[in-house]
Amino acid sequence: MGCIKSKQECNLHKTIRLKRNKENDEMHNKEKVCLVQANQEDSKFCSCTASPLLLEYAHRLSEDIVNKAVRQWAEVDSKYSDIPYIESDAV
Protein backbone atom coordinates (compact mmCIF):
# COMPACT_ATOMS: atom_id res chain seq x y z
CA MET A 1 0.00 0.00 0.00
CA GLY A 2 2.83 2.37 0.82
CA CYS A 3 4.51 1.70 -2.52
CA ILE A 4 1.42 2.52 -4.57
CA LYS A 5 0.78 5.66 -2.57
CA SER A 6 4.38 6.86 -2.94
CA LYS A 7 4.30 6.19 -6.69
CA GLN A 8 1.14 8.28 -7.03
CA GLU A 9 2.70 11.14 -5.06
CA CYS A 10 5.84 10.88 -7.15
CA ASN A 11 3.83 11.26 -10.36
CA LEU A 12 2.03 14.27 -8.88
CA HIS A 13 5.34 15.95 -7.98
CA LYS A 14 6.69 15.17 -11.45
CA THR A 15 3.61 16.75 -13.07
CA ILE A 16 3.93 19.87 -10.93
CA ARG A 17 7.65 20.12 -11.74
CA LEU A 18 6.96 19.78 -15.49
CA LYS A 19 4.29 22.50 -15.31
CA ARG A 20 6.69 24.83 -13.47
CA ASN A 21 9.46 24.19 -16.00
CA LYS A 22 7.07 24.94 -18.85
CA GLU A 23 5.91 28.16 -17.16
CA ASN A 24 9.52 29.23 -16.54
CA ASP A 25 10.41 28.59 -20.19
CA GLU A 26 7.41 30.61 -21.37
CA MET A 27 8.30 33.51 -19.06
CA HIS A 28 11.92 33.41 -20.22
CA ASN A 29 10.84 33.53 -23.87
CA LYS A 30 8.49 36.47 -23.18
CA GLU A 31 11.33 38.33 -21.44
CA LYS A 32 13.59 37.79 -24.44
CA VAL A 33 10.92 39.11 -26.80
CA CYS A 34 10.39 42.18 -24.62
CA LEU A 35 14.12 42.87 -24.47
CA VAL A 36 14.51 42.55 -28.23
CA GLN A 37 11.55 44.86 -28.84
CA ALA A 38 12.87 47.39 -26.35
CA ASN A 39 16.30 47.37 -27.99
CA GLN A 40 14.77 47.91 -31.42
CA GLU A 41 12.65 50.80 -30.16
CA ASP A 42 15.62 52.36 -28.39
CA SER A 43 17.74 52.25 -31.52
CA LYS A 44 15.00 53.95 -33.57
CA PHE A 45 14.40 56.82 -31.18
CA CYS A 46 17.83 57.23 -29.61
CA SER A 47 19.13 60.75 -29.87
CA CYS A 48 22.35 59.61 -28.16
CA THR A 49 22.69 62.86 -26.23
CA ALA A 50 22.46 63.39 -22.51
CA SER A 51 21.61 66.61 -20.79
CA PRO A 52 24.59 68.55 -19.42
CA LEU A 53 22.97 68.57 -15.99
CA LEU A 54 22.79 64.77 -15.97
CA LEU A 55 26.39 64.47 -17.14
CA GLU A 56 27.57 66.85 -14.42
CA TYR A 57 25.68 64.90 -11.77
CA ALA A 58 27.11 61.59 -13.01
CA HIS A 59 30.63 63.06 -12.98
CA ARG A 60 30.27 64.35 -9.40
CA LEU A 61 28.82 61.03 -8.30
CA SER A 62 31.67 59.06 -9.85
CA GLU A 63 34.26 61.35 -8.23
CA ASP A 64 32.55 60.89 -4.87
CA ILE A 65 32.59 57.10 -5.26
CA VAL A 66 36.28 57.10 -6.18
CA ASN A 67 37.17 59.38 -3.26
CA LYS A 68 35.32 57.15 -0.79
CA ALA A 69 37.01 54.05 -2.22
CA VAL A 70 40.47 55.63 -1.92
CA ARG A 71 39.75 56.70 1.66
CA GLN A 72 38.56 53.20 2.52
CA TRP A 73 41.64 51.66 0.93
CA ALA A 74 43.91 54.06 2.86
CA GLU A 75 42.23 53.18 6.16
CA VAL A 76 42.56 49.45 5.59
CA ASP A 77 46.13 49.85 4.36
CA SER A 78 47.10 51.84 7.46
CA LYS A 79 45.60 49.17 9.74
CA TYR A 80 47.61 46.36 8.21
CA SER A 81 50.73 48.18 7.01
CA ASP A 82 52.77 47.01 10.01
CA ILE A 83 52.24 43.35 9.08
CA PRO A 84 55.16 42.24 6.90
CA TYR A 85 54.54 40.49 3.62
CA ILE A 86 56.13 37.04 3.65
CA GLU A 87 57.04 35.59 0.31
CA SER A 88 57.00 31.86 -0.07
CA ASP A 89 58.90 29.71 -2.56
CA ALA A 90 56.49 26.83 -2.08
CA VAL A 91 54.19 26.45 -5.02
From Swiss-Prot:
One Gene Ontology cellular component: plasma membrane
InterPro entries assigned to the protein according to its UniProt record, in alphabetical order: Small_membr_AKAP
Subcellular location: Cell membrane
Keywords: Cell membrane, Lipoprotein, Membrane, Myristate, Palmitate
Gene Ontology MF terms in the entry: protein kinase A regulatory subunit binding
Modifications the protein undergoes after translation, according to the UniProt entry: May be palmitoylated at Cys-3.
This protein's record includes keyword S-adenosyl-L-methionine: no
Lipidation (N-myristoyl glycine): G2
Keyword Membrane: yes
PANTHER family, alphabetized: SMALL MEMBRANE A-KINASE ANCHOR PROTEIN
Function noted in UniProt: Binds to type I regulatory subunits of protein kinase A and may anchor/target them to the plasma membrane.
Family statement drawn from the similarity comment of this UniProt entry: Belongs to the small membrane AKAP family.
Entry protein name: Small membrane A-kinase anchor protein
Organism classification: Eukaryota, Metazoa, Chordata, Craniata, Vertebrata
